[in-house]
Amino acid sequence: MFQDNPLLAQLKQQLHSQTPRAEGVVKATEKGFGFLEVDAQKSYFIPPPQMKKVMHGDRIIAVIHSEKERESAEPEELVEPFLTRFVGKVQGKNDRLAIVPDHPLLKDAIPCRAARGLNHEFKEGDWAVAEMRRHPLKGDRSFYAELTQYITFGDDHFVPWWVTLARHNLEKEAPDGVATEMLDEGLVREDLTALDFVTIDSASTEDMDDALFAKALPDDKLQLIVAIADPTAWIAEGSKLDKAAKIRAFTNYLPGFNIPMLPRELSDDLCSLRANEVRPVLACRMTLSADGTIEDNIEFFAATIESKAKLVYDQVSDWLENTGDWKPESEAIAEQVRLLAQICQRRGEWRHNHALVFKDRPDYRFILGEKGEVLDIVAEPRRIANRIVEEAMIAANICAARVLRDKLGFGIYNVHMGFDPANADALAALLKTHGLHVDAEEVLTLDGFCKLRRELDAQPTGFLDSRIRRFQSFAEISTEPGPHFGLGLEAYATWTSPIRKYGDMINHRLLKAVIKGETATRPQDEITVQMAERRRLNRMAERDVGDWLYARFLKDKAGTDTRFAAEIVDISRGGMRVRLVDNGAIAFIPAPFLHAVRDEMVCSQENGTVQIKGETVYKVTDVIDVTIAEVRMETRSIIARPVA
């Protein structure tokens, strides 16, 4: 009798619409219960039985129940699942398989089976890619996943690399394909094979994409020719190789090895500016005045060169600093090194006075054994030879930015707008509390930004600099010329790494159109989106592999008295993140390790400080001594403890 009763249906509808609901993200805990986080201020308790319907990170709508002053959430509807495609470790064998996602907060095994057509007999410990197929909030009885790709076996020494590349859906090897002959581009190539061009790189570098030649001119001027490898002489726009490079967008540099954007035959051989080999190049000739200004007679042209020497950063630096036993093989090469050092000095001073110079941070290099084991991690400071190449490349990129802007009005530009205008007042207020007075309007201009950066660089510590970082906007890739506040430049367009950056290949094609006096087509905005996304994924992959290798490297230091100097990089409610100075590893110090009585301590992300009993004891950028308390291999996290 109640079956089709409209009154009952209406009552049900009414009850449903009157029941309080909330949308938010599920946060799991290690104790079985969880929370529905609605926003930064509001969260609801999810009891353990209800947590079985959801997964950490799911965005859901839940019914809110109130009992005896206590509110709890009952998951009702899935808005967006946290897991769709993921990597994990297989448990069980044959017919009864499950997979544990490789995520610090997902501990439960999800029942699964191999997808049809996947010819692999999965066993305990295998790594796999899986896709979620069932979810309790979608009307299914339980969670269920399908294994879509076998990654590798559990004991493979190279798990960090293969799992990370699979997680981010990135290529594992160089692209296929060969370039048989150079294209006829209708370019006249200037023969510069007699000039003493040199390359300066790491000893192990095979993909040399820049060579330099310097010459003294009258009136204390210097000429610099930057010659860049010319892959677009081999790769036609729209060809199979070009499309593959467009998707990859960059060479992916991971600790221990790289996955090139172009076939190795091109990147490490045909295009690489090897010593004593004739190579086609795209070149830029510029004149530097006595104070390092780039004069207006910038000239881009096609050429052939023959590098006369493959020089190595450390050897060149040693020689210029009068240490070590290496010396250039001839006086002609020695003269090149001296002139290039002079150019570096001038350009460095010019940028210091008229633009901005980054503080030197060391590069950290993993030294790996045959089986991927970490033998050592060394900090490689940026020395004079690194700066010679850096200054030459920055100068060449400034030239390209100007020429493309003035001749075409577009290109692939690196743009950074400094501070987000919405943050200008908050920024000025924060600086004022530290005794620095800035105008909220002026700081949004290039000159105002540079002025502030110079004041910050003159501070005794980097603390204030770290506080204002959150107000900055991100660097972007744009087809429209625009300023790069971070470098303090009106425009910046890279073209000096076409073997490893697709955007530089595009700029090569545009510069060639300028050289030939032809019209060029503006690159589509989609390409900048693809490049930005690939850059993000490559960086995440590099970080993930690094975390894994750091955990391996420091595992035997856990629980020992070995001390490490560590810089505080971030402070949150839960504790502090630090970077070990000697090797670059990131470790976490939980708040209870800082002070036993929680109520006497305030950890403030906003202020970048830890106060104990009202006294500031730690602040971001402080360097402290720590020991390694624990290394958790399953989450690749390093827990440190301050030395008392």
Swiss-Prot record:
GO BP field: mRNA catabolic process
Domain named S1 motif: residues: 561-643
A GO CC term assigned to this protein in UniProt: cytosol
Pfam family of the protein (one): RNB
Reaction(s) catalysed (UniProt annotation): Exonucleolytic cleavage in the 3'- to 5'-direction to yield nucleoside 5'-phosphates
Protein role: Involved in mRNA degradation. Hydrolyzes single-stranded polyribonucleotides processively in the 3' to 5' direction.
Family: Belongs to the RNR ribonuclease family. RNase II subfamily.
Protein name (database record): Exoribonuclease 2
Species per Swiss-Prot/TrEMBL record: Escherichia coli O9:H4 (strain HS)
Taxonomic lineage: Bacteria, Pseudomonadati, Pseudomonadota, Gammaproteobacteria, Enterobacterales
